[in-house]
């Protein structure tokens, strides 16, 4: 077992005093060929920071295009894709070498990329050119550009790979693209400034956050029709779907709350105060815990889904935004967009009398300027031939 030595630190928060308990941590031993990295886009540094999650150290800083924003990992090959908004292209990173191996030109002002589960295609929403670039990831080339609505923000591919759902912020519509024919199947008038998208595991519905109208739209993907407009809090910016698909959590940035939607019935089950300006969320694989980054209060809220209540508020860096979990889910990774660092929170069972709880700060790692998105990739290095 490797060890990481930490100390006790006191952190003032508001009128109270919160503290993290640090002591000698045991880091897991891994097989020599095992790799696990976090990749972080640094929007104002034009770089990607690579964090080795075996040692929690900066492994490499990779120069990419101008203003990197969106990032995605390929589940079938050891590649990472970085959207460069300022240079209108996508950088392909070989995760085994942690080096850029290709740059793919797309259209104007791309912000987001999604990768099909079979690892064969990438979909990039180009907000400045009102289209979606379809990338053949084996050939590393754009095979088609599909015209959609005004200022598309996201293009999300369904789990079965058959449908791409696009939120068009500029005209309040949702486009459904048929992945086989690479053509728009339906255009759905929805709501004001649609943004984030979540698609159910059974491919039946998509939910879209309407940031301008404090609603979430429910879309039937078979008929291409709007099923419901659900009232939530002000400025819903992010949707977090439980892995089982039963509930959807909405981060209401300007209401300091989350709303929980029952996806089967299209009903809002309740809304709960969670922290100042909740930005993003992530749920554990067993559907038991929700973590929410509170951009305005420099905390991460821990919400127990079974109990239906917040059980902890963890102090992190300045303006926390993007979140990820390690492959084991023993570590929560928090991007602090203003302070330019990665906060690593360890989840473990307390085994000493004076340990305060199951969450503690493991370390904070400096990255680049304005880190905004993070993805984790784990793999076994292939045997040398």
Predicted regions and their residues:
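Predominantly soluble domains enriched in secretory-pathway, periplasmic, or organellar proteins
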Residues: 2-385
